[in-house]
């Protein structure tokens, strides 16, 4: 069985040392040693003859450079070009000693000192320290400190650390990565942004025989393109990390979450059925809830993102209008004239709870035609509660399309937090809602003229920290509320440690198509990678959110690519067998999308999927209570977590996954598909997979072809598992096996 180690931090290159050979090994405690081989110029950390980390012989393990990268974009969309100046070309090690350290298990660390050389025309001092922390004695902690240098026009501002790899090693995690399973041969930036490689970042890496993460939140970049090495760039001169070893990948996730935290438990009411995403006001919401109950759809809640009102925004082409929200965080008097009473009536009359929507923006509602009670934008402007711009000497305006003037809350400002906490208490939580989608978090501007009230570093460095501060802030307010224990608080942007402050991650915003990079397939890949990154409880917008547009044609004057009833139904199947909650979304252009309530057939399909989700409730709950809560293990598990020795399993991203340990799932993620080829992972041929719909049992290590008509995603019971919790789902299978769903 392979071992699983963990490396933490942001690192780079190695070179020649000037250290004598009188000593080559220094103890850290717990049987762990730091070894330095002068002849090969290699540093390694070893425990019980197993290497936790090593560097590349004859190469720098640390480097630094000057140069300000070129960033373009704003409003959640960022791209960058590396600018390196005077990157240090060589390195020496001049001294390795034990030093006293209070937080070390044995009261000391191993300190490595030396110089980075040929940094332009200067040499730069550095120190790297390793120790076993008292609080977490199952790992090695480290920190790196690099001096800036003495050339004012060439001060170092980023560091690089390089450690050894091998050609067959694979890398997983690193947050919301949408397009591939292993990160090998990729360059992954860690920066919170809207979409693309690196989106929804969470700087954590799980490797085939190692795992790593950083403690800090500056921009970093993981370069896995070298077959024999991994280089991590970090945009600061100090960084800390951990190196760990576990006996399997699931246990490495436990060790990771022992440090970053585990997600709080989801309330049990989410197991009871669907969370209906609806827009349109009280009458429409109540009508759809009633229809759902008639359709035998288990309805747990409604999610009403338009509770604060909507306005229209021009689409890229044609005459189509996109529905946008008013970010003023008070109930809209036109759509929800009796909001407080309506929320309570849904709870009392139908047993349906209500979820709302909030983001860290406040918009100017002066042009809101149906009126408002407070203009939070004007209040925040007067109080100085938003992120500022020193060039305009005013609020840093966030643009999210035409017709929206908004600012982003400055969470470094205590006055902002006090003011907005009062808004949340009086205008959001006061209505006995049971949860909120806490959107965005990735929009903090990074330009040099961005001003924050109380932060010593610049906005660029703070950008990745904002999602965590947003999660900490909202949970601190929610904890004061009477219904806190039943609340669902879900986010889609995060940074290291955010997971302990939210009980659900949402992998939005997918396009309403079948694609790999940003369609339904990407939802599976992101949930898998986020699970490895410490986010055990996740879900996607059922049906997707973003409408894609093409240039208009005679047949399609708007250019909008509407959501089909087929993808809506298949996405519902995916949600039922993959996710911690079952929540739908109308999308940003509802009128071009098939909705679950469009007609009797779409509602029937949706209700069926909701019943399937509910039938899995007891099985999911025992996973969440016994494994996610205590060990940090994800609900949805990439096959590599159980089969790192299976080369095919290591490359599976969206095609299939485990739901807990006892169910293996292959969802239908392509149109007009009613049969699936499914690879059943594992090298142990005694391992079995029983197809729940046909009863056919197969052995591991082969590809099988199974029927997958609408309503019947390929689900297999692993090794004839049985339990009272699983039997509820199998009862559903027996009851519904003859059901025919037509689209």
Model-based region annotation:
Residues 28, 34, 96-712:
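Catalytic-domain carbohydrate-binding cleft regions of carbohydrate-active enzymes
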Residues 21-73:
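Beta-strand-rich N-terminal accessory domains
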Residues 4, 8, 49, 79, ...:
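A detector of low-complexity, intrinsically disordered, Ser/Thr/Gly/Pro/Ala-rich segments
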Residues 15-18, 167, 184, 346, ...:
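Prokaryotic Sec-type signal peptides and long signal-anchor helices
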Residues 54-116:
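A low-complexity, Ser/Thr/Gly/Pro-enriched, surface-exposed linker/loop concept
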Residues 1-22:
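Fungal secretory targeting signals
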Residues 701-743:
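C-terminal beta-strand-rich structural cap/linker in extracellular carbohydrate-active enzymes
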